[in-house]
């Protein structure tokens, strides 16, 4: 449950960094920073490389209830900054 993480952890759904999803449907970062179709495995790998201690949970984003999966990471600054760092790391890993 998200309330258990308040102040200590950040919940990340793949939709937050997906460039193919508009902001009205859940994207949180600018399209030029976001990445197309991020996979859970990529988010976990990027978070591990950034030292964020990722943990997978079988939960759905409310606007996309049919897609399961979210990642919980340690809070190290703002949520927006963390999302940008993860998106950039995934871009680097895809090269």
Swiss-Prot record:
Q: What's the chief localization of this chain?
A: cytoplasm
Q: Which residues form a coiled coil?
A: none
Molecular functions (GO terms): 7S RNA binding
Q: Which GO terms describe its biological process?
A: SRP-dependent cotranslational protein targeting to membrane, signal sequence recognition
InterPro entries (alphabetical): Signal_recog_particle_SRP19, SRP19-like_sf, SRP19_arc-type
Compartments annotated for it: namely: Cytoplasm
Key words, A-Z: Cytoplasm, Ribonucleoprotein, RNA-binding, Signal recognition particle
Q: Which domain of life is it from?
A: Archaea
* Transit peptide listed as a keyword: no
Q: Which GO terms describe its cellular component?
A: signal recognition particle
Role this protein plays: Involved in targeting and insertion of nascent membrane proteins into the cytoplasmic membrane. Binds directly to 7S RNA and mediates binding of the 54 kDa subunit of the SRP.
The family assignment reads: Belongs to the SRP19 family.
Oligomeric state and interaction partners are given as: Part of the signal recognition particle protein translocation system, which is composed of SRP and FtsY. Archaeal SRP consists of a 7S RNA molecule of 300 nucleotides and two protein subunits: SRP54 and SRP19.
Q: What is this protein called?
A: Signal recognition particle 19 kDa protein
Q: Which organism is it from?
A: Staphylothermus marinus (strain ATCC 43588 / DSM 3639 / JCM 9404 / F1)
Name of the encoding gene: srp19
